[in-house]
């Protein structure tokens, strides 16, 4: 059966948010609630080709004090456009959830699921806070016209964070002051997060 992904009508989205062709639109929790209550699931093949809907993607930065967990995607990943690119965020598409959680809890549940797929927290490392930052949009490229990112910062209690799929990516903690060295090879959404949130 084909994957179903969570989407929201593009025209309706820009009635809720100030339009920005490329960049970060600062957090509005009331908009998040409207998205989760009124979004719908579409077949991924349809959603990838239909800019009248935006696929909702969770995109989470992991931080500990003034350090950020920087990912490097390897050639083991299926998405060739991202090979050897650096990324500040983990996340992905949101799929149907059959658990009894309320719709309001759905986004957070999907974010935590994506996080657990990508990394493991060991040796007492705990999530101290999950901060919603805003919406990342990039309508300047075809893939961006059918996606919008929900940018979060996940604050963890120590640096005992490890990659699950080491054949697909590597990662290391980088001090905030050193992140700019990696900017040229960051993927687009990471550049937006860096420009509009981190610096």
Regions found by a protein language model. Give the residues of each.
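Conserved Nudix-box catalytic region and its N-terminal flanking loop in Nudix hydrolases
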Residues: 67-114
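Nudix hydrolase/Nudix homology domain
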Residues: 6, 44, 84-98, 134-199
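Short, extreme N-terminal leader segments that mark the start of a protein/domain
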Residues: 1-25
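Short, flexible beta-strand-to-coil junctions
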Residues: 8-13, 63-66, 74, 156
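Extracellular structured ligand-interaction cores
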Residues: 3-5, 53-59, 149-151
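A short coil-to-beta-strand element that immediately follows conserved catalytic motifs
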Residues: 123-133
């Amino acid at each position: 059966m084909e994957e179903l992904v969570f989407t929201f009508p593009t025209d309706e989205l820009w009635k809720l948010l100030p339009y920005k062709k490329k960049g970060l639109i600062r957090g509005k929790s009331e908009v998040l609630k409207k998205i989760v209550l009124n979004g719908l699931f579409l077949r991924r093949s349809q959603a990838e080709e239909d800019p009248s809907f935006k696929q909702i993607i969770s995109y989470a930065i992991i931080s500990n004090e003034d350090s950020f967990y920087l990912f490097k995607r390897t050639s083991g990943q299926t998405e060739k456009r991202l090979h050897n690119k650096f990324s500040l965020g983990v996340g992905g598409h949101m799929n149907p959830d059959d658990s009894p959680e309320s719709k309001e809890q759905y986004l957070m549940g999907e974010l935590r699921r994506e996080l657990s797929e990508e990394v493991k927290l060991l040796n007492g490392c705990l999530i101290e806070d999950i901060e919603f930052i805003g919406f990342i949009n990039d309508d300047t490229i075809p893939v961006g016209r059918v996606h919008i990112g929900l940018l979060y910062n996940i604050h963890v209690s120590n640096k005992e964070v490890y990659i699950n799929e080491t054949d697909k990516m590597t990662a290391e903690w980088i001090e905030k002051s050193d992140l700019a060295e990696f900017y040229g090879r960051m993927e687009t959404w990471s550049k937006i997060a860096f420009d509009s949130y981190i610096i």
